[in-house]
Regions:
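Adenosine-cofactor binding site in Rossmann-like domains, unifying the SAM/SAH pocket
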Residues: 23-44
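Active-site Tyr-X1-5-Lys
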Residues: 116-146
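Substrate-positioning beta->alpha
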Residues: 158-164, 178-201, 207-208
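N-terminal Rossmann NAD(P)H-binding glycine-rich loop of SDR-like oxidoreductase domains
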Residues: 1-21
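Glycine-rich NAD(P)-binding loop of the Rossmann-fold in SDR/ketoreductase-type enzymes
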Residues: 69-80, 115, 119, 123-126, ...
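Flexible, glycine-rich beta-alpha linker
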Residues: 102-103, 143-163
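Conserved Rossmann-fold NAD(P)-dependent oxidoreductase catalytic core, especially the SDR/UDP-sugar
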Residues: 80-120, 143-146
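NAD(P)H-binding glycine-rich loop region in Rossmannoid oxidoreductase-like domains
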Residues: 39-76, 80, 84-87, 102
Length: 215
C-alpha cells in the first residue's frame, strides 16, 4: 500500500492514477478523490502495511505567495512527513523536489552540482531535501529515499506555461516571452510518475537523486 501526500495537485492526480487501487490519497484540498491532511501540522492518520510514501505536498507557484509561506509549508511538511514515516516504520519515501535549488544559472546541471537557489521556493525545497536526508541517515541500510528534481512538468490539465503556449499557438498568436534562446528543462507528467513508481520499486536502500528532465 502507498500513501500520497499532495494527491490533489497536477502531478499527484496522475500519480494516483498510475498506482491505482494501491494508493491512499491525501491533500489539504479534497475536491478530487482525496482525504484531508494538512502536512504543515503533525500527521495523525492510521494505516497498516504502508510500503511507500510519496511526498508531493508543497507550495510551488512562483511568484504568488509570501516568502514565509514557501518555508512554512515546504519545510514543515517535510518534517511532519518524515516524523510520520518514523512513527509508522515506513522505510521508503519518494520526495518531489525541483530543479529550483540549482537556481537560474544556465550552465548544465548534474545531480551532484552545487545547489545555488535564487528564490524562496528553491531554498525551501533544498532545506526539505536535507530534512528527508536526515531521516534516511538514521537507518541508512534500511531506508530508501528517492529525490526527484523535475523541470517544467507538462501534460493534460497542467494549466501553466505549456497550456498557455498551446492555447496561444492554437489561436496563431505565438510569441516569445523574453529571449528567443531561452532553454527549458521539461518532462511529460506521465513519464515523471512512471519513473517515480519504478524507482520506488527498484532502488536499493540509500539516497537516490534524479534530475527528471529530458536530455
Amino acid at each position: 500500500m502507498n500513501l500520497i501526500f499532495g494527491a490533489d495537485g497536477f502531478i499527484g492526480k496522475q500519480l494516483s492514477r498510475q498506482i491505482g487501487s494501491k494508493a491512499n490519497c491525501f491533500d489539504i484540498n479534497t475536491a478530487y478523490d482525496t482525504k484531508y491532511c494538512d502536512v504543515r501540522k503533525p500527521i495523525e492518520i492510521e494505516f497498516e502495511n504502508i510500503a511507500v510514501i510519496y511526498n508531493l505536498a508543497a507550495i510551488h507557484k512562483t511568484p504568488g505567495h509570501a516568502y514565509s509561506e514557501y518555508f512554512e509549508t515546504n519545510i514543515n511538511g517535510a518534517k511532519n512527513v518524515c516524523n510520520f514515516a518514523r512513527n509508522e516504520n515506513i522505510d521508503t519515501i519518494v520526495f518531489t523536489s525541483s530543479i529550483a535549488p540549482y537556481g537560474t544559472w544556465e550552465d548544465e546541471k548534474f545531480e551532484d552540482s552545487l545547489p545555488l537557489p535564487t528564490s524562496p521556493y528553491g531554498s525551501s525545497k533544498l532545506v526539505a531535501e536535507e530534512i528527508h536526508k536526515r531521516w534516511q541517515a538514521e537507518k541508512p541500510s534500511e531506508r530508501k529515499l528517492i529525490i526527484v528534481r523535475p523541470g517544467v512538468v507538462f501534460g493534460q490539465n497542467e494549466d501553466g506555461n505549456f497550456t498557455r503556449l498551446y492555447r496561444a499557438m492554437k489561436k496563431r498568436q505565438f510569441f516569445y516571452p523574453g529571449r528567443k534562446d531561452t532553454k527549458k528543462a521539461a518532462i511529460y507528467v506521465k513519464d515523471l510518475v512512471r519513473l517515480m513508481v519504478e524507482m520506488a520499486e527498484k532502488e536499493e536502500p540509500g539516497v537516490h537523486i534524479y534530475n527528471t528532465v529530458y536530455a
